[in-house]
Amino acid sequence: MEYFYTSQCPDMDHLRSLSVANRWLETDLPLGDDAKDVAALSEPELEFYRFLFAFLSAADDLVNVNLGSLSELFTQKDILHYYIEQECIEVVHSRVYSAIQLMLFRGDAAARERYVRAALRDEAIRRKVEWLDSRVAECASVAEKYLLMILIEGIFFASSFASISYLRTHNLFVVTCQSNDFISRDEAIHTSASCCIYNNYLGDAPRPDEARIHQLFAEAVEIECEFLRARAPRDSLLLDLPAIISYVRYSADRLLQAIGASPLFGAPAPAADFPMALMVAEKHTNFFERRSTNYTGTVVNDL
């Protein structure tokens, strides 16, 4: 062990620096301004967004139970420092999700608790958790565990983030959409970090072959798309389900390319009017390098 800092992983140090430059707090965003918009949602739409935020708020705990702390595998301080930054921003995400949940239940904390406990037993969420359970159990190497982390961070949140962003197209929940931009931006860094570690810092750990990689990606994308189809409100004008599903598949192909695998889905890039302000890791990086300070201003479309 070295008892002083030396740079060993400049790419991971760059990702840590991006995280530091874009720190934010739950107090930066006045979510109370969005409370008036709850009444603008139909009951099926309100149910859908309550469900999404129940999943997102619980996702970190569900993941950690299965994959544990991958940071314990490393001694390089750049990687350890990066993970400290990631843990700090995940605390902010958790607090923001809690505040949004409470807003969607009009301040009724008991109703929120009952709902979340029931939602976590829903088949759409259980399918994600059970898939992760089974794939962790059969992991042949730490590299495959990192593949699962890439899929969780890069695919299993994708339809939720996109669905939340559609509220912006109706001028609803402006601050919630801004927090969604920040959180999806943060998760893009987390996904990039997992890809970076997978590519560069797992030593001699055997990598899955491309057939196995494609199998895991195909399963994760199918589960994510079915998650959306199962819970999205019928006949709602808020969402464009085909566009979100195409976005999930496009995101999967970009991640495959990021780890040196061939694309699987051939989905086109999202249209210019797709409401996600930030969509892929490269765009996120460009956004971060500009260091946004407009926490309460207009969200920049960086497509």
From Swiss-Prot:
Subcellular location(s) of the protein: Host membrane
Transmembrane parts of this sequence: 147-167
Molecular function terms from GO: metal ion binding; ribonucleoside-diphosphate reductase activity, thioredoxin disulfide as acceptor
Active site: Y97
Keywords: DNA replication, Host membrane, Iron, Membrane, Metal-binding, Oxidoreductase, Transmembrane, Transmembrane helix, Viral latency, Viral reactivation from latency
Binding residues annotated for Fe cation 1, in chain numbering: D60, E90, H93
The enzyme's E.C. designation: 1.17.4.1
GO CC terms, sorted: host cell membrane; membrane
Sequence positions that bind Fe cation 2: E90, E153, E187, H190
Membrane topology field: Single-pass membrane protein
The protein's required cofactors: Fe cation
InterPro entries with a match to the protein in the record: Ferritin-like_SF (IPR009078), HSV_RIR2 (IPR034715), RNR-like (IPR012348), RNR_small (IPR033909), RNR_small_AS (IPR030475), RNR_small_fam (IPR000358)
UniProt enzyme class: oxidoreductase
Catalytic activity: a 2'-deoxyribonucleoside 5'-diphosphate + [thioredoxin]-disulfide + H2O = a ribonucleoside 5'-diphosphate + [thioredoxin]-dithiol
Protein origin, superkingdom: Viruses
Similarity comment: Belongs to the ribonucleoside diphosphate reductase small chain family.
Function text: Ribonucleoside-diphosphate reductase holoenzyme provides the precursors necessary for viral DNA synthesis. Allows virus growth in non-dividing cells, as well as reactivation from latency in infected hosts. Catalyzes the biosynthesis of deoxyribonucleotides from the corresponding ribonucleotides.
PANTHER family, A to Z: RIBONUCLEOSIDE-DIPHOSPHATE REDUCTASE SMALL CHAIN, RIBONUCLEOSIDE-DIPHOSPHATE REDUCTASE SUBUNIT M2
SUBUNIT field: Heterotetramer composed of a homodimer of the large subunit (R1) and a homodimer of the small subunit (R2). Larger multisubunit protein complex are also active, composed of (R1)n(R2)n.
The protein, known as: Ribonucleoside-diphosphate reductase small subunit
